[in-house]
Regions:
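C-terminal helical subdomain
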Residues: 166, 173-174, 189-212
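Catalytic loop of short-chain dehydrogenase/reductase
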Residues: 124-152, 157-158, 162-165
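Substrate-binding pocket helix/loop in short-chain dehydrogenase/reductase
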Residues: 87-88, 95-97
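Rossmann-fold cofactor-recognition segment
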Residues: 43-59
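Conserved NAD(P)H cofactor-binding loop of Rossmann-fold oxidoreductase domains
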Residues: 79-85
Length: 212
């Protein structure tokens, strides 16, 4: 399989790279080049992992062709995420734009850019969402922008699930609860989640690769 994954320099994304690079070709898109290089060096089959350290929203067809060549894409995992924990009255437009650019627009943009490659492979898109972005679930103070961005991603997933059937592309979202990632620790110092990034990566593998 050829798998493209965003937000893979740490956390769940990095664990997925470790897992999938054993038997698949993995193409990572993330901004932290230093962490990506360290991740590649740590892999047993490091030749199976290629990366580009660039903002998703700056990518275009030319830069993707330079990165991916002419390969088909079997799986796209839109995993990149940004969490800001800030009271509603303190939120500025810049906060909103940063979060929406990463959590929503990045997934929208990359899914569109890769649609032809995914269609040729009869592939799948997995959007990593959050329970905070699901209607009717518990919501928490300070997460108005984050939860709203994940809600937008969830609705986008539902729309694309229907719209991309004619392209033979399956689209799903996984709404995560708390996972003990660096992002969670930065937003909620001292909070301990029950699920590790490795455990979540193994679960994602079970539905994306083993379940495909």
């Amino acid at each position: 399989m050829n798998i493209v994954i965003t937000g893979c320099s740490q956390g769940i994304g990095a664990e997925l790279v470790k897992l999938w690079s054993t038997n698949h070709r993995v193409f990572g898109i993330s901004r932290n080049r230093e962490k990506l290089e360290m991740l590649k060096l740590s892999l047993e089959n490091h030749e199976n992992f290629s990366f580009i350290s660039e903002s998703i929203n700056d990518l275009n067809q030319d830069s993707l062709t330079e990165f991916l060549g002419q390969i088909k894409v079997d799986v796209l995992v839109n995993n990149a995420g940004l969490l800001i924990n800030k009271p509603f009255l303190e939120i500025q437009y810049e906060d909103y734009k940063r979060v929406m650019d990463v959590n929503f627009w990045g997934a929208f943009h990359l899914s569109k850019l890769l649609l032809d490659r995914l269609s040729k492979a009869k592939g799948q898109i997995l959007n990593i969402s959050s329970m905070g972005g699901v209607n009717g679930t518990s919501k928490f103070p300070g997460l108005s922008v984050y939860s709203s961005s994940k809600g937008a991603l969830t609705i986008l997933t539902e729309c694309l699930y229907e719209e991309l059937k004619e392209y033979n592309v399956r689209v799903n979202a996984l709404a995560l609860g708390a996972v003990q990632t660096e992002m969670l620790d930065q937003a909620f110092p001292g909070y301990k989640a029950d699920t590790s990034p490795k455990q979540m990566a193994e679960f994602i593998d079970s539905i994306v690769v083993k379940g495909s």
